[in-house]
Amino acid sequence: IPRPIGWISTVDLEGRDNLAPFSQFQNVTFDPPIVMFASNQNSLGERKDSVRNAESTGQFVWNMATYDLREAVNISAEELPHGVDEFERAGLTKLPSRLIKPKRVQGSPIHFECTYLNTVRFPGASLMGTVDVVFGRVVAVHIDDACLTPDGLVDVLKIQPLARMGYYDYTYVDNQFRMVIPGNNEAVLAGLEGSPLRARAATGGER
């Protein structure tokens, strides 16, 4: 089953940049906007840089992985020593963020700047040890204008987001269809749209 990729950029306390993709990434809620990514330990039994950096600095960026960026995503997945810059290794250009310190990936069409909320640790049964599930609140969103439709919606077919499957397999979005659930419950429809303003209006205004 395809899963969105958490291409997470962070910076450590010494100012060294880090970039890594995670197969377990998802939005948790849209109001407030919260996302999560899950990370096993590395092959040495250590917590990964992305987790440690997010916890120590309180910040991370999600960069949308796309079909055009697939090779760079794969290169940035390699397990490397602490302090190695995956941006440079993958030949990527860095963009400054607006509110936080971690850099963004130039060429990625959408970025979420996130502030760290908390980590939930689960015991792991594999050789990779425990699993860290990191939660963050989205404080800024960047969307490339070239990836918007005339109506101001994200053109997913143009972006071609990359998704992780099983084994060594990936896929990308090249087809979509639209369905609206029956009924006229405005609060439910607003929730499905992911529209905070419409949801608040449908439930009695600002909260």
PLM feature spans:
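Basic, polyanion-binding surface patches
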Residues: I1-R207
